[in-house]
């Protein structure tokens, strides 16, 4: 996975050198991509790298189609925002809140069933008798 990230992403020194950079990504799942991009930007001379994530922190497995079936592989489940910021070597890190996500898409989640289970652990269907059993699920 890290080699794939290395091959498809690079930073242009003439653009980022000496600058404060804000990197925006859709999510952080395992942390591999964010860590690598921050490193590329700093190696290219970025003065600071601030990371903003356009989803709430993914703390719970998704059983509805996304390939994250255990808590262990979800970095936001294992680390606080400050710890994750340090791990990816960013100067700052922030996630959009659940409420902020709803507002950004003009969505009333009370009236419609937007699945937020990977963010808050409230699954829309009863998959297992307990969350402990769900966490042992392996694809």
What are these regions (language model features)?
Residues 1-139:
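PRPP-associated nucleotide enzymes
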